[in-house]
Amino acid sequence: MDVFYRPELGLIVEHLGTDNELVDCMDGRLLNPGHAIEAMWFIMDLGKRLGDQALIEKAVKIALAEAEYGWDKQYGGIFYFMDRLGRPLQQLEWDQKLWWVHIETLITMIKGYELTGNAECLAWFERIHDYVWSHFMDPEHPEWFGYLNRQGEVLLTLKGGKWKGCFHVPRGLMQVYQSLERIAEKHD
């Protein structure tokens, strides 16, 4: 939160130089919105345990900035990788939409709403929810596809493999459910 988060960018970077400076090379410019957004719900949980509302608010602010930056304004969904200067990336899969990025964003946004009441978090939760259920879900054989192309079309029909196992989706849906339950209890 104090090193890889760069206030001058409003974003979390993946790599820094030896003196924690921004580096102008492919690795130095690499952004992974999914990692940054996922990390923010971990920070929110930490803030809740510590009773540190300011930490929670900072995590929400960063998560919202990352979602906005990472959102594909042409086709929807969150990019897998980005370059902080908008330059070409060496990762060929940079523009794909991956299941784990989207489930982690659902968790982060509903937790952000639960812990702060921030309406932007709820709006992002709804936006991501709509994208997920209209693009990742297989209506014939329920479970999520893991990999979509930039346009939101299924790239691979497999639903499990080396990287996509039985972790992100069930854990994510459980986290979302628990947050929604707590939100409902507050409004009863």
What are these regions (language model features)?
Residues 1-188:
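Glycan-recognition and catalytic cores of secretory/periplasmic carbohydrate-active enzymes
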